[in-house]
A protein has these predicted regions:
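Solvent-exposed loop/turn and edge beta-strand elements of beta-rich ligand-binding domains
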Residues: 1-293
Length: 293
């Protein structure tokens, strides 16, 4: 049986004694004493951190739905590129209970010490091995591209089981919110900048859009949504769009105005892990119709 905190060593030691073998003599009995070192390894922890979040799966609707009636569909997936730091959440002592010259127990780590830095791979997982038993704090420091940083730290404790269990395994899962996209156009009178209601715009894909598996789910030029300017001249596209290139075009001009053939380009990109919603707004102006008599 191994001491608490250690694992039984199943290896045998062969001892060969001859006239050349070093020994000590017992002072009382004069017996020869031969010393052999035999060590046990401490039990250790293995931490798996997994990163999850929504990934683009498809663009779907009913059986006869056209592109305007379809919605972007997301599913939970594994995320690569998340970076975590693992800290000691308490003083973590050696299992042998040894003390230093001042009588303090010897430590692997003091509370707050950085123990490991982990980065998730394609499977969304990262592993820290050979952690001394104790409690640790795990903090996300870098979110995957396209996602918002998860500010919630988690703790995990590795507790000794028995002398037959060399590795105690624990896991933590962190989820991230996708950075959302807000695209809008403000419709204005070109002469006095007053808002114009009643203009209809279409939003089109300006490039092929692919899902998480690399499959094209929307071809360039596809009409995705129509929206009408309100009393404030605001035209808001409300679907849950992924980051991509889009173009907005006026498809029905408001009464009393000249058609504007210009388009609004939205080259949307990730705005960093601290931004929940990437906002894109452009102004679009129409010239009033004039009459000469």
């Amino acid at each position: 049986k191994a001491p608490i905190g250690y694992v039984v060593n199943d290896n045998y030691i062969n001892i060969s004694v001859d006239t050349d073998t070093a020994f000590e003599t017992d002072g009382d009995t004069n017996d020869a004493i031969i010393t052999v070192e035999y060590s046990d390894a401490p039990a250790v922890g293995e931490l798996t951190v997994e990163k999850k979040g929504e990934v683009l799966d498809g663009f779907k609707g009913g059986l006869f739905a056209n592109s305007e009636d379809k919605e972007f569909v997301y599913k939970e997936g594994s995320l690569a590129g998340a970076v975590f730091k693992v800290y000691a959440a308490e003083d973590i002592f050696t299992a042998d209970k040894q003390k230093d010259a001042d009588g303090n127990r010897t430590k692997y780590y003091s509370k707050g010490d950085l123990v490991a830095t982990l980065t998730t791979g394609k499977d969304g997982k990262a592993v820290a091995k050979n952690l001394p038993l104790g409690q640790y704090k795990v903090v996300e420091v870098t979110a995957p591209d396209g996602y918002v940083l998860n500010p919630n730290e988690q703790t995990v404790t590795f507790t000794y089981v028995d002398d037959k269990t060399p590795v105690i395994k624990e896991s933590l899962t962190f989820s991230n919110d996708r950075q959302k996209l807000d695209m809008s156009v403000t419709k204005l009178d070109s002469e006095d900048n007053t808002p114009i209601a009643g203009a209809v715009f279409g939003l089109y894909a300006d490039e092929d859009i692919k899902n998480v598996d690399g499959k094209v789910i929307i071809e360039k030029g596809t009409l995705l949504e129509k929206a009408t300017s309100d009393e404030n001249g605001k035209i808001t596209f409300v679907k849950d769009y992924p980051f991509a290139k889009y173009v907005a075009k006026e498809i029905e001009k408001p009464a009393g105005y000249v058609t504007n053939e210009e388009v609004v380009n939205f080259d949307t990109k990730y705005q960093g892990q601290d931004v929940k919603t990437a906002v894109y707004n452009s102004e679009y102006k129409n010239t009033p119709t004039t009459f000469e008599f």
